């Protein structure tokens, strides 16, 4: 049995993860939660801060906000247990901190936990270099009106994957305005916020005579929860410090 502490247990994703752990993952048990809202109805105790939690566990799973990062890393270092980061909105300084922390603890990070997005991300490594010479590349990401970070972490993941796959130097733009001709080396990430859109990411390769679109739509938050719980199963026995991702969980390398 994999024992999990869930940070952000009272939020929307916390509810979904808690439910799926009980109904679909017999080898995973949420043994405690961490959240500012300690009054949520859960089958496990909820603590306001990591340092208040004294429950024995195997994996610390975070689905909250970027500002929880340092306290979670500190807790994982103290307990010598793996940390799974599923939050987005990290700054450049945060990412550097994550990189350094992975030298001390087993640290898993993914901008998107869905199997589909991670397949798309790996597909882009092959597709982008083939199409770049004759196609312009644009991205559109759409999310609900409560999402606070823009562009989404997933959009940045896809954009950076495309950049890293190309031999030429490219520059990212975030939205367009004004009067200017598009430059060949631009990759523009466009953001939409509205309604209850769970998550929609579209990569557009626009050529003179044809357009190729690679699109992923999340129609249920279950896809993120399933990925997160699979990551918990994968990370439970990890003791060696290092960086881990969904590529490791899904054994993606194509």
Curated annotation (Swiss-Prot):
**Which residues of this protein are catalytic?**
143 (proton donor/acceptor), 147 (proton donor)
Enzyme class, top EC level, equals oxidoreductase
**CDD domains registered for this protein in UniProt:** DHDPR_N
The cross-references to Pfam families, in alphabetical order and at most eight, read: DapB_C, DapB_N
Q: Does the keyword Chloroplast apply?
A: no
For this protein, the record's NCBIfam families field holds: dapB
Going by the UniProt record, its keywords in alphabetical order are:
Amino-acid biosynthesis, Cytoplasm, Diaminopimelate biosynthesis, Lysine biosynthesis, NAD, NADP, Oxidoreductase
Q: Does the keyword Protease apply?
A: no
Transmembrane ranges? none
Q: Name one GO cellular component term.
A: cytosol
Recite the lineage of the species.
Answer: Bacteria, Bacillati, Bacillota, Clostridia, Eubacteriales
Q: What is this protein called?
A: 4-hydroxy-tetrahydrodipicolinate reductase
Q: Which segments does the entry list as coiled coil?
A: none
Give the catalytic activity: (S)-2,3,4,5-tetrahydrodipicolinate + NAD(+) + H2O = (2S,4S)-4-hydroxy-2,3,4,5-tetrahydrodipicolinate + NADH + H(+); (S)-2,3,4,5-tetrahydrodipicolinate + NADP(+) + H2O = (2S,4S)-4-hydroxy-2,3,4,5-tetrahydrodipicolinate + NADPH + H(+)
Its pathway?
Amino-acid biosynthesis; L-lysine biosynthesis via DAP pathway; (S)-tetrahydrodipicolinate from L-aspartate: step 4/4
Entry binding sites for (S)-2,3,4,5-tetrahydrodipicolinate: 144, 153-154
């Amino acid at each position: 049995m994999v024992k999990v502490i869930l940070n952000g247990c009272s939020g929307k994703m916390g509810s979904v993860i808690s439910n799926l752990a009980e109904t679909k993952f017999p080898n995973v048990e949420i043994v405690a939660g961490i959240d500012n809202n300690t009054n949520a109805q859960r089958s496990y105790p909820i603590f306001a801060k990591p340092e208040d939690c004294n429950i024995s566990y195997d994996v610390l799973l975070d689905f909250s906000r970027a500002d929880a990062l340092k306290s979670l890393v500190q807790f994982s270092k103290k307990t010598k247990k793996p940390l799974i980061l599923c939050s987005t909105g990290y700054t450049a300084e945060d990412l550097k901190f994550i990189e350094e922390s992975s030298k001390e603890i087993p640290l898993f990070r993914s901008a998107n936990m869905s199997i589909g997005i991670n397949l798309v991300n790996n597909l882009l490594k092959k597709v982008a270099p083939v199409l770049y010479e004759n196609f312009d590349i644009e991205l559109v990401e759409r999310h609900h009106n409560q999402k606070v970070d823009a562009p989404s972490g997933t959009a940045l993941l896809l954009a950076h994957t495309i950049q890293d796959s190309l031999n030429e130097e490219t520059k990212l733009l975030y939205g367009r305005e004004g009067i200017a001709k598009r430059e060949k080396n631009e990759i523009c990430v466009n953001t939409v916020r509205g309604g209850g859109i769970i998550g929609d990411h579209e990569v557009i390769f626009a050529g003179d005579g044809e357009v190729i679109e690679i699109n992923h739509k999340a129609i249920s938050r279950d896809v993120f929860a399933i990925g997160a719980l699979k990551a918990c199963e994968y990370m439970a026995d990890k003791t060696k410090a290092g960086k881990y991702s969904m590529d490791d969980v899904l054994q993606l390398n194509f």
